[in-house]
């Protein structure tokens, strides 16, 4: 059918006069249904239709106003000012016919009988004096508040006509409350029926105009938008608001994509910045009947003032808009749970430099009141609980304010996805969402937010009430590896500080022997709703599954080829659903401890390959070989935090270092021997014997089960000597009865920054036969692991010399802090001394080939290890143009894991690994630091350290 509000204005053109991209946002299949909304027969004597756009009170086009006066015989000798908002009051017979034509239009559209001209004219005050008419017109022209007198007539009108009249009055009141209205365009979008479809159009509707937006108003009149859900893919801003019934705004339309704001090009050309669309509802109804759109010429942080003015104006005409649900009264248990959530979010934000963390609560709408505890359902919405949120970066407060004004539904954003799946959900870039998937994405783009993770928790305080925590990673962290490391660290921090918060587990999951509360990996494709509080998994520090990688196990992701987490290890997911992972989960559950023990003597890789083959053959299905990461996860489930053979290799390397030192001791005939059974040095043999692998495994395995170390398998890069010696944690030097007793003497200060153990005697009056004039230079790794530096000699305790100094790499606290003491022996001195040592070939002094990668760039150069770790950082920084202290290096070790390189001791360890592998080249990964290195010993902060 023809649009009943078709314009009769000449000079405004029709759809054929404009490019097709300006028409509307409907799909191509609706093109045939869209009629020409502007007719060419404006001079048709049988119809004197004139819409609101023709009224001088609301239209600012000079040509249109001239036509208006000419058509109805009005004098246009005195030009109408267009620089301000004006009103045109009906005051003469011909003007009355203009008004009558509008009501004729309304009556015709809704099937009412048209009133006769005589009946219409009798209801208006007319003047036969042309001078009086002219004077009244001049008087009205100078007024700023525009609301025509036609609204005072008493002709019966239809409901739709009443809505138009109300919107005119509401715009008038809005202009009064907002001042001059400078820099504002306000226009109303109402549904019209075109064929079998309803479209939103602002043509022939009331509007409020600033002159600078006249062209944009003309463009808007030529657009139509979908008024029904699923009618088209791109409903545009008015369409989205009409369908959802929720206000939507942006401080700048540039934060929209082109298909989200279909008039983007025209908005840019006309300097449109801020925009808000407000749904209009009848006072007694809940369905949206119109949309009011406001655009501004200035970028606005929010539309609070405009929203308040519009609400008051609508209330005055018995209309309303959708209100933001206010929170219900919180019980004491809810306040306790929210207080703990805020403490957790505050700690996490400070420790890991997160910009902000939000807490969402599922609610239902009950007369504009949020009622928490609502389960998944049709009326469920997710609302921000402001009292539990924490903003670490004050610039992000505007984003929190925007979230407060907009509730999310199920499946919207990572919060909605985490809510329905009971699984943590991760997005590497929330800005990439479409506005239909994440309704506040325009605000996320404004503040530059990137990666975020959401997790659903419950509290023992509130039973089955759900809380969804949304954590935003630092905006500068865009690399997948950086995000992986931070998520692992986040997991450990949250497990340590959460007291009553619990994650929701899958209903019906069977508890296996040895299973403790914690985050477990499970099938991501099916997560039924939890029905009992017993189906919780407590985040507990003393849990057997408190690995820093288990927090986000089984986490889902938003895109293909994006980062996903499986038991804490981020991997590149080549498919959203991989059938082999289900088989892998079943296979993992059937690897027993006895099966693992049979492979302890071999390497981790060989054991993974062997166990995978055996298991798949047992099940006679889908040949699968475990990767080392999978086997590590299985070991942790059995309480094995480190593969035993690697411990033995570490012990042997350390003992070889000790043997090098002992062989250089003067005055001990035949050298010293370290007895692994007693933990003592015995001067009976000229060499030290490596620990037998099988014998060492039996003792270390029992010790490992008893200790239940808190460290992850790949993170444990330190060697604890006390695992291979007696309980007293001391080194005993048992001298032979023929040896002289040690006499007091002076000791030379030595460098302990991770170099091989050295015994050095200072020049003094005592010769070698008089006693041992040396000092034990303890490795920084052993000291940081809590080893007692006290040295026992012949049953008497000898404290280390007070002048002794060392460089300690505090890798145990995860901060990578370097605490350096004074040292009189440098790396160069040690290298000079090493050249005279018979065992110098073990460490090697050949040139090292370095291959470093930073983001998309890779460099290769030769490096002399003797210059030390600081020089290596300088060489890498010089090639990538990075400042000192702004990046960190990690090298690929013999188990293909990335290990931090911070100090010279780390470099020496790297060289030894390369020597054992027979290689002379090393790969380095360069990663940016979000904060300078350094923290207190007890800090759990994420300050650039990795696994």
Swiss-Prot record:
Gene3D superfamilies: Phosphatidylinositol 3-kinase Catalytic Subunit, Chain A, domain 1 (3.10.20.90). One of its GO terms (molecular function) is DNA-binding transcription factor activity. Residues 522-533, 550-572 have a biased composition (Polar residues). The keyword Membrane does not apply. Residues 126-135, 573-587 have a biased composition (Basic and acidic residues). Residues 114-135, 509-533, 550-591, 805-828 are annotated as: Disordered. One of its GO terms (biological process) is regulation of DNA-templated transcription. Residues 577-671 form the RWP-RK domain. InterPro entries: NLP (IPR045012), NLP1-9_GAF (IPR055081), PB1-like (IPR053793), PB1_dom (IPR000270), PB1_NLP (IPR034891), RWP-RK_dom (IPR003035). Residues 646-666 form a coiled coil. Residues 847-929 form the PB1 domain. Probable transcription factor. This is Protein NLP8. It comes from Arabidopsis thaliana. The gene is NLP8.
